[in-house]
């Protein structure tokens, strides 16, 4: 199963089969993108927002390396890579005020209110916290999209950027599995994208069971679940010389 090929000649397409749950899925490389969710200092580096807010980021380092492996395989095969970065303008207008539920629920905003010395430092565009981690820097041909909320499809250019390139299949990696990754994947499903979660290339925020809950939700209701090893194997089968 794969996305709409938009009238393109099937003979010109390059397809591979990805081992996944609940069943394998066929991915046409030209119509598939790896979507990297929020691999920013805020979420994966000591001293970033998530660390300062009291969440355990110990698992993030391993995820960075596995995502780098995924991206190398994807680029070698000619697959599109899209980086998402979560945050707001330096004045936090995009974050919303007290009339927005985001003002009340964002742990970054709550942390800054509790610790005034951090004001203006967390998830502000142009700052260290907002920047992508050193181990995952965009390469020529990669796409970067800003997002102001958990779902990368909300008030962003993501949907139009993907549709303009004929992308119908999305392979998700990043942080946090149970928040921004799942929110974006669910919205992708509702927008008729075929969504795959690479479960060992994601990291959750909170207790271990929330990772398992997201994996269950994706496998049963919203898409397909695979692994870094299986993804890279499928890319090697079609890698450009």
Curated annotation (Swiss-Prot):
The keyword Hydrolase applies. Its EC number is 3.5.1.110. Gene3D superfamilies: Isochorismatase-like. One of its GO terms (biological process) is nitrogen utilization. It catalyses: (Z)-3-ureidoacrylate + H2O + H(+) = (Z)-3-aminoacrylate + NH4(+) + CO2; (Z)-3-ureidoacrylate + H2O = (Z)-3-aminoacrylate + carbamate + H(+); (Z)-2-methylureidoacrylate + H2O + H(+) = (Z)-2-methylaminoacrylate + NH4(+) + CO2. Keywords: Hydrolase. GO terms for molecular function: hydrolase activity, acting on carbon-nitrogen (but not peptide) bonds, in linear amides. The active site is at 38 (proton acceptor), 147, 180 (nucleophile). Pfam families: Isochorismatase. Belongs to the isochorismatase family. RutB subfamily. Hydrolyzes ureidoacrylate to form aminoacrylate and carbamate. The carbamate hydrolyzes spontaneously, thereby releasing one of the nitrogen atoms of the pyrimidine ring as ammonia and one of its carbon atoms as CO2. PANTHER family: ISOCHORISMATASE-LIKE DOMAIN-CONTAINING PROTEIN, PEROXYUREIDOACRYLATE/UREIDOACRYLATE AMIDOHYDROLASE-RELATED. NCBIfam families: RutB. This is Ureidoacrylate amidohydrolase RutB. It comes from Haliangium ochraceum (strain DSM 14365 / JCM 11303 / SMP-2). The gene is rutB.
């Amino acid at each position: 199963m794969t996305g709409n090929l938009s009238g393109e000649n099937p003979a010109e397409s390059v397809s591979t089969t990805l081992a996944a749950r609940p069943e394998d899925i066929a991915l046409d490389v030209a119509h598939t993108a790896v979507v990297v969710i929020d691999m920013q200092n805020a979420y994966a580096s000591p001293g970033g927002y998530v660390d300062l807010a009291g969440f355990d980021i110990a698992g993030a380092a391993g995820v960075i390396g596995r995502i780098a492996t995924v991206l190398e395989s994807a680029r070698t095969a000619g697959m599109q890579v899209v980086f998402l970065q979560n945050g707001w303008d330096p004045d936090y207008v995009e974050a919303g005020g007290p009339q927005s539920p985001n003002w009340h629920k964002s742990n970054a905003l709550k942390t800054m209110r509790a610790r005034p010395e951090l004001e203006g430092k967390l998830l502000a565009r142009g700052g260290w916290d907002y920047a992508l981690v050193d181990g995952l820097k965009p390469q020529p041909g990669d796409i970067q999209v800003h997002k102001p909320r958990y779902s990368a499809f909300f008030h962003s250019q993501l949907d139009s950027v993907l549709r303009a390139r004929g992308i119908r299949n999305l392979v998700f990696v990043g942080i946090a599995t149970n928040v921004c990754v799942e929110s974006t994947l669910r919205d992708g499903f509702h927008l008729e994208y075929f969504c795959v979660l690479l479960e060992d290339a994601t990291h959750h925020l909170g207790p271990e069971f929330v990772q398992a809950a997201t994996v269950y939700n994706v496998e049963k209701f919203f898409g397909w679940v695979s692994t870094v090893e299986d993804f890279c194997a499928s890319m090697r089968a079609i890698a450009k010389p």
